[in-house]
């Protein structure tokens, strides 16, 4: 539990020796700080190189040639709108607090929780793994175009053998080079990336100059794979220079077969390839653990990189459309080299871009994997990824990722992987947008990012656009990715994860609950929609576990509050003793599997504490209308924690994770004869207080004897037939007459019916006992009662019971303390209570009837079949001096009846209208 002194942010200024910690928690005990990268080297450079990847050199012609300039621009605009929406969300989350290693995974998991964050983090990791393989395959393709045995053109040095096995070998060798750089750490990676950035920038500059400086030329096209070069006439593509007719020819779409795969291209397939090249916006965020100031570097560097790459793509699209015919664009994806003033510089750019993109994907994947392993979401399967070097470099995660990339290289074809990689990236982007949307909708005061150029509209549009594009690109891959995410989330939920990160779902639920509680108007309540809202007062849950579960069954979709009064005076205590108890009571609710709130209070007496809880428990229109108490008798309390399987604890007294066992958090049951916290006088006074507050009252006796199968959560499969007996008559003031079922009697019928609707009680039969006066003819009253039950839609058996000469007739009286103040003496009341008890026991099969004024019973009944008995609870007497006598009569009335509920209802709860 957080205290007043608990910080809102875990941020330490000084270490143990007084040395200042690095910002954002960079310093880790025993591990040197690895936060060395600036905004430019840590975010701008890797993001630009990842967003260019091989697309900028090898797929510009592919996109423009198949889609045409207009559709290519539309694709680029759509792609960058999606990216921009996600970038806004990334910037908002990154500027709302300290960002540690793991990048997008860290943001998602700390917002949506470990289940969703872990599943999407693993998928984003796989997307980076596949992205690394795609970049390497593109690099192999570009190398073989020049140096392969089947390469065409006079500039080709045809020394490298080709084929699936050779291509796999080349990719594996390049992967070894990339993995070696990443294994040596982020510092070497940053220097290599900067060198690569310079090479790529120089290469792109030479290409842009070549579009203007080179004159028209014919460029020979290589024969398609699988064709005999000698039997196919030589074909040429044309570089026309800036030409208006070339631009007009390239404006519209011209989808054809991809000469590398033979597959027919469509808008979706071309967009997948283009978008895959633009999906590197998280490259900088993935390096969050190595950035000096990630909260500033991530938003600033990402925005700069996105704007720069968008401008370069637009420029290349226009230049290609103005100068190259469609045949050249569609049949020679590496035409930049053919039109360059110095072709080797383009080759250097291609190789450098592909290498840098693969390095960025591999090192980003390793950081995500290391963060997943540190959070221990997937157990020992990711244990090797926790290994770090002395400088904090997670080389174990790098080697782990290297092995997975090697497996992906077996797929072989660049465009084959593009759709899957794109869909996985889109899932991660949608999750980032959803995280920001959730934080914005939750309206939590601590969500106040310094980056404010976003709103819930941009977040929602980002989520929708990502999901739409997923299914547009590949419906199968999109459906499979969502299914995979669901399975991983279910796995993590079943396994359990850290709960200290915070769940935005809790903030969203609070926001929605508050909104609807304000709309829940008590002035609009109607008896048709009445439901029980219970406040169960418990002294020690060890002895009240069956009652705890029975009350959970009685609530029927209503409110259930578990209340407890701690005796004490806050003025004489150094701190509030109630707050530390909440955790134990919430654990009790979880283990007992009941749907209850917990409300604790501190009071000098139990009676005053009960008054507090009756007045202040609940909120708005959700406040208790019924008080439930255990019965006050001399029976020794039982410790149900010892016999209930849900509460069985390890021998050492600790639960999983090292937390104290629940059995150690509650005191042992009260020993027989020991003093009680509540006197008989205060017990009856508490009942009287509840009735004065217009609350219904339920007193539960002997609930520990309930059949265990009736307290289970599922349907009961008990072979024994059980009854639920209802006596809707004040047995301490017997009377006949046509109107004896009053408000309290109807409340009994309602509560018994509610219990019969619970699956565990479906097989139990509801019996209602109709008490007849000595001069009342049988049949007539039963007919009236059956008509009433029919109107109330209550299915039950009706059994007539004839009282002796002591029964009264007439309408029920509303006099408080009816039987006590009704003129009967104590001896007569005691005799009547004994007679009523014998009557009920006889109908249960617990014994035969005897005594004056007793009913006609059934002798020789075999064993009790009644699982639970509902009895009418009379009002307490008006004179507090008679409270002990009242309690003694209740004890006599309910003695040896087994599980019994004595109920007094004060509010109408039934309705016969539609």
Curated annotation (Swiss-Prot):
GO terms for molecular function: chloride:monoatomic cation symporter activity; metal ion transmembrane transporter activity. Residues 1-36, 94-119, 189-193, 284-297, 360-376, 438-466, 762-914 are cytoplasmic. Its main location: membrane. It is a multi-pass membrane protein. It comes from the Eukaryota. One of its GO terms (cellular component) is plasma membrane. It is found in: Cell membrane; Lysosome membrane. Keywords: Cell membrane, Glycoprotein, Lysosome, Membrane, Phosphoprotein, Transmembrane, Transmembrane helix, Transport. The chain crosses the membrane at residues 37-57, 73-93, 120-140, 168-188, 194-214, 263-283, 298-318, 339-359, 377-399, 417-437, 467-487, 741-761. One of its GO terms (biological process) is inorganic cation transmembrane transport. Residues 58-72, 141-167, 215-262, 319-338, 400-416, 488-740 are extracellular. The keyword Transport applies. The modification Phosphoserine is found at residue 6. Glycans are attached at residues 228, 243. Residues 645-678, 844-864 are annotated as: Disordered. Pfam families: AA_permease, SLC12. May be an inhibitor of SLC12A1. Seems to correspond to a subunit of a multimeric transport system and thus, additional subunits may be required for its function. May play a role in lysosomal ion flux and osmoregulation. Interacts with SLC12A1. Belongs to the SLC12A transporter family. This is Solute carrier family 12 member 9. The gene is Slc12a9.
């Amino acid at each position: 539990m957080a205290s007043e002194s608990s910080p809102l942010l875990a941020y330490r200024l000084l270490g143990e020796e007084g040395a200042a910690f690095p910002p954002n928690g960079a310093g880790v005990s025993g591990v040197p700080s690895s936060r060395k990268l600036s905004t430019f080297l840590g975010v701008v450079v890797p993001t630009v190189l990842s967003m260019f990847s091989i697309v900028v050199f090898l797929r510009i012609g592919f996109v423009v040639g198949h889609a045409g300039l207009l559709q290519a621009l539309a694709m680029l605009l759509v792609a960058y709108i999606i990216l921009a929406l996600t970038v806004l969300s990334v910037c908002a989350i990154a500027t709302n607090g300290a960002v540690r290693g793991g990048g997008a995974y860290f943001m998602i998991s700390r917002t949506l929780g470990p289940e969703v964050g872990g599943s999407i983090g693993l998928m984003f990791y796989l997307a980076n793994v596949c992205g690394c393989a795609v970049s390497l395959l593109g690099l192999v393709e570009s190398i073989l175009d020049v140096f392969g045995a089947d390469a065409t053109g006079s500039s080709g040095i045809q020394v490298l053998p080709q084929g699936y096995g050779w291509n796999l070998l080349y990719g594996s060798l390049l992967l070894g080079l990339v993995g070696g750089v990443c294994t040596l750490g982020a510092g070497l990676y940053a220097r290599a990336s900067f060198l690569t950035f310079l090479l790529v920038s120089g290469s792109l500059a030479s290409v842009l100059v070549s579009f203007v400086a080179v004159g028209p030329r014919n460029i020979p096209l290589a024969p398609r794979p699988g064709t005999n070069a000698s039997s196919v006439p030589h074909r040429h593509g044309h570089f026309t220079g800036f030409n208006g007719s070339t631009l007009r020819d390239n404006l519209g779409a011209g989808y054809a077969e991809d000469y590398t795969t033979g597959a027919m291209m469509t808008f979706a397939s071309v967009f997948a390839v283009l978008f895959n090249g633009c999906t590197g916006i998280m490259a900088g965020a993935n390096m969050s653990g190595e950035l000096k100031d990630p909260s500033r570097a991530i938003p600033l560097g990402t925005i700069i990189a996105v704007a720069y790459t968008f401008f370069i793509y637009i420029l290349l699209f226009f230049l290609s459309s103005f100068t190259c015919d469609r045949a050249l664009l569609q049949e020679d994806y590496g035409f930049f080299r053919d039109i360059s003033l110095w072709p080797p510089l383009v080759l250097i750019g291609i190789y450098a871009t592909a290498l840098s993109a693969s390095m960025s994907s591999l090192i980003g994947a390793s950081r995500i994997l290391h963060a997943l392993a540190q959070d221990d979401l997937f157990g020992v399967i990711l244990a090797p990824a926790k290994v770090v070097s002395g400088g904090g470099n997670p080389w174990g995660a790098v080697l782990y990722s290297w092995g997975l990339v090697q497996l992906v290289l077996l797929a072989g074809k660049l465009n084959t992987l593009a759709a899957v990689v794109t869909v996985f990236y889109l899932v991660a982007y949608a999750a980032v947008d959803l995280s920001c949307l959730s934080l914005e909708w939750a309206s939590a005061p601590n969500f106040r990012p310094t980056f404010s150029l976003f709103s819930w509209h941009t977040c929602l549009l980002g989520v929708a656009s990502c999901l739409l594009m997923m299914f547009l690109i590949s419906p199968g891959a999109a459906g499979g990715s969502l299914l995979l995410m669901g399975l991983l989330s279910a796995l993590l939920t079943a396994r359990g994860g850290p709960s200290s990160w915070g769940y935005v779902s809790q903030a969203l639920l609070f926001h929605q609950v508050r909104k609807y509680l304000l709309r829940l108007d008590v002035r609009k309540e109607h008896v048709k929609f009445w439901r029980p809202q219970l406040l169960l007062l418990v002294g020690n849950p060890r002895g009240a576990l069956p009652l705890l579960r029975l009350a959970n069954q009685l609530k029927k979709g209503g409110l259930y509050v578990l209340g407890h009064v701690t005796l004490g005076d806050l003025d004489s205590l150094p701190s509030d003793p109630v707050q530390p108890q909440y955790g134990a009571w919430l654990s009790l609710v979880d283990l007992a599997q009941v749907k209850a709130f917990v409300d604790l209070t501190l009071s000098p007496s139990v009676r005053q504490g009960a008054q507090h809880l009756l007045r202040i428990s609940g909120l708005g229109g959700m406040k208790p209308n019924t008080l439930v108490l255990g019965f006050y008798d001399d029976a020794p309390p039982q410790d149900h924690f010892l016999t209930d399987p849900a509460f069985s604890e390890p021998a050492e007294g600790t639960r999983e994770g090292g937390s104290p066992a629940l059995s150690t958090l509650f005191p042992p049951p009260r020993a027989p004869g020991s003093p009680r916290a509540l006197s008989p006088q205060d017990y009856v006074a508490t009942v009287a207080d509840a009735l004065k507050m217009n609350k219904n009252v339920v007193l539960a006796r002997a609930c520990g004897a309930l059949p265990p199968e009736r307290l289970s959560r599922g349907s009961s499969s008990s072979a024994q037939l059980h009854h639920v007996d209802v006596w809707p008559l004040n047995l301490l003031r017997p009377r006949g007459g046509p109107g004896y079922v009053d408000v309290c009697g109807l409340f009994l019928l309602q509560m018994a019916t509610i219990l019969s609707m619970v699956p565990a009680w479906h097989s139990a039969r509801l019996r209602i006992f109709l008490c007849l006066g000595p001069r009342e003819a049988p049949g007539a009253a039963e007919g009236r009662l059956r008509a009433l039950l029919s109107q109330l839609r209550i299915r039950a058996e009706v059994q007539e019971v004839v009282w002796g000469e002591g029964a009264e007739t007439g309408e029920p009286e509303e006099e408080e303390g009816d039987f006590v103040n009704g003129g009967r003496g104590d001896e007569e009341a005691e005799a009547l209570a004994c007679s009523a008890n014998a009557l009920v026991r006889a109908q249960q099969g617990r014994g035969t009837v005897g005594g004056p004024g007793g009913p006609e019973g059934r002798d020789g009944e075999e064993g009790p079949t009644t699982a639970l008995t509902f009895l009418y609870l009379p009002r307490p007497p008006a004179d507090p001096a008679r409270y002990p006598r009242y309690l003694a009569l209740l004890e006599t009335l309910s003695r040896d009846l087994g599980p019994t509920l004595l109920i007094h209802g004060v509010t109408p709860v039934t309705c016969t209208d539609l």
